[in-house]
């Protein structure tokens, strides 16, 4: 079971991501592109180019979780920014 602290930080990768990436690939994007360190109290959110799939990577103190969502219709709203990340 996942539980989140009241001071949860959410980092959104603004560039589209290859949804075939798993734990290691997403961890690499976080450390190399977003220049962040996956840590407790933070969620890292990724989407594909069509904005129909979502992956969230989080650390619970004992290991990494990858959560996925695929929309059957419609798309996710996504922020735009030149620096490649957003902190919500």
Label the predicted regions.
Residues 1-85:
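Polybasic/polar functional segments that serve as interface/processing modules
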